[in-house]
Amino acid sequence: MTQTSYIDIIRKIDSFTYEEDEFYYKLKAHDGSATLGYITPTISKYFEDEQDILLDAEKKTLTISPYLDTIEKRNAMFSLIATKWRKIPYFSESLDKGWRNELYTVYNPTHTPYVQIERAFSVLIGVITYGVHINGYVPPHKSSNGSLKMWVPRRSATKPTYPGMLDNTVAGGLGYPYGIWETVIKECYEEAGLEEDFVNSHVRSAGVVLYIFEPNGQKDTIQPEVEYIYDLEFDNETDVLPYPEDGEAEDFTLMDVSEVLDRLLKNEFKPNCGLVVTDFLVRHGYITPESDKNYLEIVSRCHRMMPFPTI
């Protein structure tokens, strides 16, 4: 398997240009106050038949109709469009087969819920989505060989995205109406069978990572993502063991950090999980300015400024 570098891992997931890209249409709020997402010209054309989205081909904008001045009205409008588009062959893979019956919240202005949309539909309109990623680990002074170890699951072979790849110990999207902490507790049990009392007493907030991913390459849909990061320290290697509670993972392996580094550089981790692991390794001193000449770019690109309002 081809060996990569830490900066390549970051560039792969934070792949969208840092310059303004005139290729995309801008999804604008009903009062014109903010840009909420970037949409490809191909997808933008499907809005021509939607009376509640005003398309301006010259300005390359898609503006939510001014009369949709409440979150309830906007929710209803996007729900109607998403449901209708499920039947369009062009969206059969991304929308129909990817339908999750889970709502993601878009914010505008910052901190204020503006609209809730189907998770699968969010990918089509390039809005920010949110999640939590949790690094389960045994610190060196508590491990059997004096080396830091991480609990690493392998994604189920039946997963529609990145089947069989390595993942973070726990990860999940921030679906309405759950908050960040509620999602941490919920996902820890659902994905790894970890009880709430254990999580409450062992997990700590470790920051946030932000990036804009192009899952299908350049000039296609974009995925701006914000992931809240938590470190979950285990007391030892045996007392509490994560296991695949909901079948999202095939198994969990307690890997020595040297093996994690090796598999990370062999591109065995799901792309955004590779970034989260890299961030963990930076924070715990396994990637340093002395060990990697691209250290500054690695750290800064794990924390990209977003062009849209945020949570």
Language-model features and meaning:
Residues M1-M165, G173-Y189, G193-A249, V257-I311:
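N-terminal leader/linker segments that precede catalytic domains of diphosphate-processing enzymes
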Residues L254:
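Short aromatic/basic micro-patch
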